[in-house]
Amino acid sequence: MDVVEVATPGGSYPIHIGPGRLDALDASIPADATAIAVVTNPTVAGLYGARVEAALARTGKRVLRIELPDGEAHKDWQTLNLIFDALLENRLDRRAVLVALGGGVIGDMTGFAAAVYMRGIRFVQVPTTLLAQVDSSVGGKTAVNHPLGKNMIGAFYQPVAVEIDTEVLGTLPAREVSAGLAEVIKYGLILDAGFWQWCEDNVGALRALEPRALAYAIRRSCELKAQVVGQDERESGLRAILNLGHTFGHAIESGLGYGEWLHGEAVGCGMVQAAELSTLAAGFPAADVQRVRDLVREIGCPTVAPDLGAERWLALMQVDKKTEGGEIRFVLMPRIGQALSRAAPEADVRTALERTTR
């Protein structure tokens, strides 16, 4: 088992990475917990619900299951209220603990529910998709979507632990694996050129879910994110670079309708768009744009964005958490392994859109 420590002003906690972590979840529950509520969806519950509940039952606490509808389309206030309804109907108090068993949607919604229920209760992240394991479960970002923008209603709220069972990835559809790998290669692009090169060299092993390659990719991704979050928990500076590809990607998700593309697919395509914009606005080498496009294609993600029309693209990107004073800010790369967040000239954005949409 690998352990990565996350240390932030909002809380320090371990990330446990390895096979069989689902069977050890009882160890992650605080001793003074009065009850445990497992928040999940029908798909994950059918695969792992009974196993997780058996592990949690060893704590001697009452264990409640809350099942939410599956998918990004249900990441909203209406679905969030299903969590609150169950917690209140079952009289869970401030010492109850939530367990987020699922992908990014479940993790984000459970974390947000924990942040606001009775003004804050504890929760544990148990991510079951690759994307959630390497990205959304780490760092304390929690949110629901609004019809006008993705993740616009939320809070920074850290879990007490993240439990990553690498064996659960064997049940993931290939498309979900590709979506998760987009976030993996992102860390190399923004923070670690050596890791980017390793991803290029090992893309076949990663797509095949080769255990050693996968374990290293997950650990290194968590290490890099933990370093950034430890320096900038609330995204007031450095943490913004973790949003590489997300300004374009969120526009794709909003423009097509949540759930049409997976989040990781939109981010992967958005990284190609960000690379093109970086050649115009940050001096990114043109040859490296092709490297980005090639690796995004090799992990199985789209490299051509939908043609939403330039004006609609710009309007969608205005509804972004990084927009300041009406000015859209992008994560740009001077070179592989280095990134910065700043505004880009609209003419450059339009050119990048022309090069990357169809």
From Swiss-Prot:
Give the record's GO CC terms.
cytoplasm
Q: Which Pfam families match?
A: DHQ_synthase, DHQS_C
InterPro entries registered for this protein in UniProt? Dehydroquinate_synthase, DHQ_synth_AroB, DHQ_synth_fam, DHQS/DOIS_N, DHQS_C
Q: What class of enzyme is it?
A: lyase
Q: What is its EC number?
A: 4.2.3.4
**Per UniProt, where does NAD(+) bind?**
70-75, 104-108, 128-129, 141, 150
The GO annotation for biological process reads: amino acid biosynthetic process; aromatic amino acid family biosynthetic process; chorismate biosynthetic process
Give the protein's cofactors. Answer: NAD(+); Co(2+); Zn(2+)
Q: How is the cofactor bound?
A: Binds 1 divalent metal cation per subunit. Can use either Co(2+) or Zn(2+).
What are the UniProt keywords, alphabetically? Answer: Amino-acid biosynthesis, Aromatic amino acid biosynthesis, Cobalt, Cytoplasm, Lyase, Metal-binding, NAD, Nucleotide-binding, Zinc
Under catalytic activity, the entry for this protein gives: 7-phospho-2-dehydro-3-deoxy-D-arabino-heptonate = 3-dehydroquinate + phosphate
| SUPFAM superfamilies attached to this UniProt entry | Dehydroquinate synthase-like
**In which compartments does the protein localize?**
Cytoplasm
Q: Where does this protein hold Zn(2+)? A: 183, 246, 263
Which pathway is recorded for this entry?
Metabolic intermediate biosynthesis; chorismate biosynthesis; chorismate from D-erythrose 4-phosphate and phosphoenolpyruvate: step 2/7
Please give one Gene Ontology molecular function term for this protein: nucleotide binding
Q: Which family does it belong to?
A: Belongs to the sugar phosphate cyclases superfamily. Dehydroquinate synthase family.
Described by its record, this protein's role is as follows: Catalyzes the conversion of 3-deoxy-D-arabino-heptulosonate 7-phosphate (DAHP) to dehydroquinate (DHQ).
Q: HAMAP family of this UniProt entry?
A: DHQ_synthase (MF_00110)
**UniProt protein name:** 3-dehydroquinate synthase
Q: What organism is the protein native to? A: Bordetella pertussis (strain Tohama I / ATCC BAA-589 / NCTC 13251)
